[in-house]
């Protein structure tokens, strides 16, 4: 571990650029060095997007939109419109993904465009709450649908649910640590499984329509309100619809592991988002052919109720489909979130050991173990659902900040290479819709949003003490270096090399925070470079 294995914490050089790609450029599969391998093709890329968007919600409780829309027709319109807005946001992320081709997604874009503090706050809220709680909830949903048939007359024991959820997390963490190819194969298989289950639901809906069972789809009935119309509730329906499409940006977290990202990133987005929109709209239409709006709203597991009504002895397919869907969802979330933490550590925003990969498997084992451990900790707390409510607003806030960064980058750096360059009307449309939902969220739940902001702002002192403050006591640096070395030996990991060439070229010598955002002018650098440096 002599070459590039150890990190020098006590340095005199103070960087001030938007990124560190000169020290840590895109990982490559070429050469013989240790580097992240480009093993994610177009099919696997689509599997990551579709698998992360489609979790258990469309099977279990797609009723949030209908409940707030007030009519079947308006609910279908909400699903279509939110799908279109999601596609617009994905187009914006596609341009950013090929303009700043780094893993880390919106964290990397916000950091490079607006500076280190903004990027750190995005990372902080993701590390602290968003990913651990979401993964814990998905794993608990998986265990609930696996154990429920064993307890037909009562609820499964809570300890059993949490134990099976922990086993699920540990198993998938092992798969992800072992091989990127294994992880993507698991994602492909389980994404295909959930799409087949949804295709069955849609086909059954078509059969119902052919039988004349479309009372609630007739125009006069579709827009028959079962509650008083309210603009606030309609806005809430759009907010629920937007949350249902969450995960559309996850492929941007693994850009460096994509085969030919300049082509496959936008292609995967263009294929996946319309596919998910189609599935969401027609699955909800299918549900309405078998259930009245009141029955749908009263059901705790819509797909299971649908199966009981139409599939007869084959109704067991639906709970199994939910379990398979959530299992794949946990895998996709582990895969992408670990790359976010890897990217954060590479920029000096998290402990440096998280930026290392296994010397043979080329997987970010420390980042995966960190992700798994934080999720296991969430499994033993009873407040994770409350935390999700608090930070959901913050997560949505950063979507808009990232898209706004696209406009800022167009203005400040108009000449940098952009393999994809969309019309600025698209980010403007997305930001208008985003602002509408954001303002409504603040108006309807000011306390929840305020607590979410407070949780995010706890990252400010952490940033200045842990990242911005460079000249820490030598005893502290020595202790951290010792922990890093021990972790390296336990996990058999090193920093990735530049091109798999000489070890000296890939050595990660400095991981200090960079203060100057990408959009700040720097006349000494070439206009096509995204990095800014200050001696």
Swiss-Prot record:
pH dependency: Optimum pH is 6.5.
GO MF entries: amino acid transmembrane transporter activity; antiporter activity; glycine transmembrane transporter activity; L-alanine transmembrane transporter activity; L-leucine transmembrane transporter activity; peptide antigen binding; protein heterodimerization activity; thyroid hormone transmembrane transporter activity
Record-listed Phosphoserine modification sites: 19, 28-29, 529
TM stretches of this protein: 45-65, 74-95, 117-149, 158-178, 182-210, 231-252, 266-287, 313-338, 365-382, 387-408, 424-446, 447-466
Superkingdom assignment: Eukaryota
Record-level GO cellular component terms: apical plasma membrane; basolateral plasma membrane; membrane; microvillus membrane
Coiled-coil region(s): none
Keyword terms, alphabetized: Amino-acid transport, Antiport, Cell membrane, Disulfide bond, Membrane, Phosphoprotein, Transmembrane, Transmembrane helix, Transport
Known regulation of activity: The transporter activity is inhibited by 2-aminobicyclo-(2,2,1)heptane-2-carboxylic acid (BCH) (a specific inhibitor of system L transport).
Chain positions of site Important for substrate specificity: 134, 246
Name the UniProt record assigns to this protein: Large neutral amino acids transporter small subunit 2
Upper lineage: Eukaryota, Metazoa, Chordata, Craniata, Vertebrata
């Amino acid at each position: 571990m002599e070459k590039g294995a150890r990190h020098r914490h006590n340095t005199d050089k103070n960087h001030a650029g938007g990124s560190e790609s000169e020290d840590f450029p895109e990982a490559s599969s070429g050469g013989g060095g240790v580097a992240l391998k480009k093993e994610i093709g177009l099919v696997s890329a689509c599997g990551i997007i579709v698998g992360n968007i489609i979790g258990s919600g469309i099977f279990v409780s797609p009723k949030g939109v209908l409940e707030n829309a007030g009519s079947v027709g308006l609910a279908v319109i909400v699903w279509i419109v939110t799908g279109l807005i999601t596609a617009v946001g994905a187009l914006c992320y596609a341009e950013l993904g090929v303009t700043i081709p780094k893993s880390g997604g919106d964290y990397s874009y916000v950091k490079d465009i607006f500076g280190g503090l903004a990027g750190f706050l995005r990372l902080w809220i993701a590390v602290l709450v968003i990913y651990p709680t979401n993964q814990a909830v998905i794993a608990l949903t998986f265990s609930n649908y696996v154990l429920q048939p064993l307890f037909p007359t009562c609820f499964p024991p809570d300890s059993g649910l949490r134990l099976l959820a922990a086993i699920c997390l540990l198993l998938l963490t092992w798969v992800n640590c072992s091989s990127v190819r294994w992880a993507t194969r698991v994602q492909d298989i389980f994404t295909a499984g959930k799409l087949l289950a949804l295709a069955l639901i849609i086909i059954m809906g078509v059969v119902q329509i052919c039988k004349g069972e479309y009372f609630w789809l007739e125009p006069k009935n579709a827009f028959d309100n079962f509650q008083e119309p309210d603009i606030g509730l309609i806005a809430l329906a759009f907010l629920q619809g937007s949350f249902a499409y969450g995960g559309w940006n996850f492929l941007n977290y693994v850009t460096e592991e994509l085969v030919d990202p300049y082509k496959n990133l936008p292609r995967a987005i263009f294929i996946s988002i319309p596919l998910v929109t189609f599935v969401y709209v027609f699955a909800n239409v299918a549900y309405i052919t078998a259930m009245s709006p009141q029955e749908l709203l009263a059901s705790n597991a819509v797909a299971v109720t649908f199966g009981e009504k139409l599939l007869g002895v084959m109704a067991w397919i639906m709970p199994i489909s939910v379990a398979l869907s959530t299992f794949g969802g946990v895998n996709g979330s582990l895969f992408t979130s670990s790359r976010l933490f890897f990217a954060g550590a590479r920029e000096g925003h998290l402990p440096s050991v998280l930026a290392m990969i296994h010397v043979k498997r080329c997987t970010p084992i420390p980042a995966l173990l960190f992700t798994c451990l934080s999720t296991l900790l969430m499994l033993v707390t009873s407040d994770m659902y409350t935390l999700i409510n608090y930070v959901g607003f913050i997560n949505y806030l950063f979507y808009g900040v990232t898209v706004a960064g696209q406009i800022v980058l167009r203005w400040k750096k108009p000449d940098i290479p952009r393999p994809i360059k969309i019309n600025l009307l698209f980010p403007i449309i997305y930001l208008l819709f985003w602002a509408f939902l954001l303002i409504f969220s603040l108006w309807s739940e000011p306390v929840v949003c305020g607590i979410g902001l407070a949780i995010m702002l706890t990252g400010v002192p952490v940033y200045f003490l842990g990242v911005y403050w460079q000249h820490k006591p030598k005893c502290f640096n020595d202790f951290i270096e010792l922990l890093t070395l021990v972790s390296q030996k336990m996990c058999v990991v090193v920093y990735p090399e530049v091109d798999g060439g000489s070890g000296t070229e890939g050595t990660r010598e400095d991981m200090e925070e960079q203060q100057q955002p990408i959009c700040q002018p720097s006349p000494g650098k070439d206009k096509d470079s995204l990095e800014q440096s200050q001696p």
